[in-house]
Design a protein with these regions (language model features):
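Conserved catalytic core of the tyrosine transesterase superfamily
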Residues: 1-233
């Protein structure tokens, strides 16, 4: 059945899908689904950033990838940032609206700060507002929506040839695993990620980092067997 256009308050024709409350009360198609933790590799992340290009849209998308990956923010934390929340001199990012609206300050490395510079330069020419904002059109300068950012990330990853799920939280996973591999103490990783309890961080990393068990089992010696067993390994 075709969707009949409606008229908004200004008398303009609009599809019901664009009207406020269109899907109110309807659960999203992926409600209840869980996705395995599968952080992208550095090569895959860099490939996505290169695919983004060098215009303002590309700079914005690359900067979002960097903040999720090199600072480990949640997507809503990143999209809630303002320009004044960034302190490049100290290398810090102020998260004003973390999970359960908790406030915290996190760090980001020099590589990350260098990578977001093109977007910071572009952002100066746009209206004051959220760090990650709409670039064109009547809503220019307003907050970039979560759904729009996710769609762009997904399309960019496909175009870059990334064959695994490339979602904002996967980049946060990558950040956590990298910190652990670098020997960062678990309590510091907990504070960086904004977990309320250390046990949450331990469980989080246990589920997404299997290198130790893989390397240990892979290095096992072959089984000892009697020469007459007739089994060649």
């Amino acid at each position: 059945m075709s969707v009949q256009p409606l008229l908004d308050a200004a008398g303009r024709r609009r599809s019901p899908a664009t009207m406020p409350g269109f899907r109110a009360g309807i659960a999203p198609r992926n409600k209840g689904q869980s996705y395995p933790a599968d952080p992208p590799t550095v090569d895959e992340i860099v490939a996505v950033m290169r695919q983004a290009g060098h215009d303002r849209h590309g700079h914005r998308l690359s900067a979002l990838v960097v903040v999720l990956w090199r600072a480990g923010l949640r997507i809503h934390e990143a999209l809630s940032l303002t320009e004044t929340d960034l302190d490049g001199r100290r290398g810090s990012i102020l998260v004003r609206h973390g999970k359960n609206d908790r406030r915290r300050e996190v760090g980001m490395d020099a590589c990350g700060w260098s990578a977001i510079e093109p977007w910071l330069a572009d952002r100066v020419g746009l209206p004051v507002g959220p760090l990650f904002c709409v670039i064109d059109g009547p809503t220019r300068g307003r907050a970039w929506s979560d759904s729009a950012a996710r769609v762009e990330l997904r399309h960019l990853a496909l175009n870059a040839g990334v064959r695994r799920r490339f979602a904002p939280h996967q980049l946060r996973h990558a950040h956590a695993v990298e910190l652990m591999h670098e020997g960062i103490p678990l309590p510091l990783i907990q504070r960086q990620l904004g977990h309320s309890h250390l046990s949450t961080t331990g469980t989080y990393l246990e589920g997404i980092n299997n290198e130790e068990i893989i390397s240990t089992v892979h290095a096992r010696r072959p089984p000892m067997m009697h020469a007459s067993a007739g089994l060649a390994l």
